[in-house]
Amino acid sequence: MTTTEVAQQLVELCRHGKFDETHQTLFADDAKSTEADDSMGPRVVQGLDALKAKAVAFQAGVEEFHGVTISDPIVAGNSFAITWSVDATFKGRGRMTMDEVCVYQVKDGKVIAEQFFY
């Protein structure tokens, strides 16, 4: 898959709530994920199993999702970016909206790195 195809598929899956499927189909086994800070867990994790565990931990911290908005991707070379807005009630933290920019790197048709800015 091209970077554009990976980007479009990631956005489509996420818009339909198929977050687990993104890891299984679009990410490399040694993919790296970098958060802006460590307020919700480790700042950096590497490896598909670690990325999946991070996603499970995030979802476990949510009492209720009220809405998710994901932009169309902007693609340049082997990278793409999307904006992501999550309106959710978090356990022990209340309801909040999180806005972030997500940047992904693609190699050989798989996401090898993701980084979040918020």
Each model region followed by its residue ranges:
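Short, cysteine-centered beta-strand-loop-beta hairpins and adjacent loop/turn segments enriched
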Residues: 88-97
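Residue-level signal for well-ordered, solvent-exposed loop/turn and beta-edge residues enriched
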Residues: 32, 94, 110-112
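Hydrophobic/aromatic beta-strand elements that line small-molecule binding cavities or substrate pockets
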Residues: 68-74, 85-86, 99-104
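Short beta-strand segments enriched in hydrophobic/aromatic residues
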Residues: 27, 86-88, 102, 118
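Short acidic-aromatic low-complexity motifs
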Residues: 1-30
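Short beta-strand edge/turn micro-motifs at domain boundaries
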Residues: 99-118
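A solvent-exposed, acidic/Ser-Thr-rich amphipathic alpha-helical stretch
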Residues: 24-71
